[in-house]
Amino acid sequence: MIKTLQNTLKQDKEHLTVPKSVQDTIPIRRIWPDGLFQFGGKFSKTIRFSDINYAIASKEDKTSMFLGYSELLNALDTGSTTKITINNKRLNRRNFEREILIPPQGDHLDGGRSEYNAMLLDKVTDSSNSMVQERYVTVSTHKKTPEEARTFFDRVMNDVTTRLNHLDSHCEELDAVERLRVLHDFYRVGEESRFHIDLRECMKTGRSFKDTICPDSMEFWKDHFIMGDKYGRAMFLKEYASYIKDSMINELTSLNRTMMLSIDVIPVPTDEAVREMQNRLLGVETNVTNWQRRQNSNNNFSAVVPYDLEQQRKETREMLDDLTTRDQRMMFAVVTLVHLADSKEELDSDTETLQSIARKHLCQLTTLNWQQDAGLVTALPIGLRRIDALRTLTTEALAVLMPFKAQEIRDRGGIYYGQNVISKNLIIADRKQLLNGNGFVLGVSGSGKSFTAKREITALALSTQDDILIIDPESEYRPLVEGLGGQVVEISATSSNHINAMDMEQGYGEGENPVVLKSEFLLSLCEQSVGAGKLSAKEKSIIDRCTAQCYHDYVRDGCRGQAPTLQDFHAELLRQPEAEARDVALALELFTEGSLNTFAKPTNVDMSSRIACYDIRKLGKQLLSMGMLVILDSFLNRITRNRRLGRNTWIYIDEIYLLFQHEYSANFLFTLWKRVRKYGACCTGLTQNVDDLLQSHTARTMLANSEFLVMLNQASTDRLELARLLNISDNQLSYITNVDFGRGLIKCGSAIVPFMDNFPRHTQLYKLMTTKPSDLAA
């Protein structure tokens, strides 16, 4: 026998003791606050790691992930046993309600909060997504003292964490309380919210930690066990197919039941493995030679070597070749699974379902007869292995038992963005946690762009006190904004509402000279009036000079009093000696003294409402781009003020592509996009004209650098452009190809997740958000 395996089996051997209490069925002997557990002469520690997007990755990405996972398995320490566990656990309803639901605040929006909370609860009580999956790596080793064990784990856990991080999986080492919580939630299903343990208090009172986590009763029978009021069954993978698909583990754990599936791995040093395979090959060759000698003695010189001997020789040579030339390692592994149910009938039905999944992959999943207690502790992420049905595998064969499925987005304190198409879990994201919270919502007309933005606006209005500012070129947001108690400001050439394009808040420009940024803005404004690319260098210098002169007194007085207007700027241009100044003044005259002078007068709009929508539908083509620019600049003033007050600001710009049609307006937007992040604000651009958007280099840069993107149904040319720009695989592209309303991909940080959102249509909130004519008619 291989020496490493012999030593491991010897170290794992335990004295047989009959448990006299429920606590005795939990084999942990000692625990330390840092998460170190001891059982027998072994110590263990556990890492929790997040899922990655394996199921929908492209073939190349899957290969890369597979090789990365193989490297992790190859790097496992030969002096230890590693357990990879997938834990299907019920969603903790109380924690969910505390983290996700919006508490009433005693104002006019409580009705909306009640509807919104009911929608969320409906989605999580649906059986398909009432489970959450957690993944753990538990490493156990035989050491003489806890100090030796800690030194070993510091090295090994750091290596495992680094390799998981390379796969884009986030890791955290579990302390004693977290490890006990995992066991408590399994032993006492349905009582997750009651878990509480104070290790210091336990030490003071002499109370065992097992009292907190153990079930009320345990009964072990031949082929099942009863734990409290739950029925359970421990099983193991007995027969392996010659070829296993990498989706088998995911299919087994997709059953909507409380379940633990563990893969125990004992790595073998390569020199021992090679020596073992050489000895086996020598044995096979000896058998072949002896057989041929017997045939020769019978004068049968043309006999063919029997198939079974030939097969043994071929397989042994392949295994030896894997070990010596293909960078494979020999490993011993056992797959155990424990699942729970509410009744014996349900348990038997679930067992049959699991066995049929295994049979589909030509494997045999068998019940552990008279070993239910051993199977239970082997499947749990304690680090113990009491099932000796070990199977010899290479790295490649073991890596096929892939624990990854689909990435989840669940940020603490985030808001609802839909459901993960693959796992059916809620997508809860907090854009403020991203490096850059700015984003885009992209999709063809009718795909649900406006609805997506409105759903986010609704969630923010109901759950925060943040300011929400909207540029609305199509008069789509009025019902929602008014329903949320916000203010709709209609801006047009004939409207009595005016916004001064030259308003400037104290602190405008991030502590730098505010006139520099304002000069950039006025250059953008003048470019809108004279035409894209038609401003000469002389004209730019004159505009910059006049801007400084207009603001001289206002800035000197600390931005107090009456801000200058475009009419003042126009007058300043006329005072300049250059002929070019008069040309610029003439081009601006329509917007300062003429019929389109709505932005050339002092602001008379009440800007106090925290939810404000600027309806610019009636601005007309001449004023539309300029109007969007002026409103954006007024938003920058609002953000500057909110920064002083410590308040977050959310900006929504519908039909954002209009701003990229002129160089200076695109540059001003780019500057705003970069600045607002530091000011505690997030910008969101919406457009169906992705092709137009990508014509601008500035827009491409902004899109590529945005940490948050919602991609709904896309036109074919737009899909290809987005795939190139964002490195989206063909599999992922299928989620934005000819899909229904409210379906697509959401990019949040490094995660790209397919989502769907079926918002209940009977609610008052839906009626405020929808723009479908059929819904409005109803």
Question: For each of these PLM feature ranges, what is it?
Answer:
Residues 452:
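Hydrophobic positions on the alpha1 helix immediately C-terminal to the Walker A/P-loop
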Residues 459-469, 637:
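Post-Walker A helix-loop "phosphate-sensing" segment adjacent to the P-loop in P-loop NTPases
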Residues 726-778:
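Conserved P-loop NTPase
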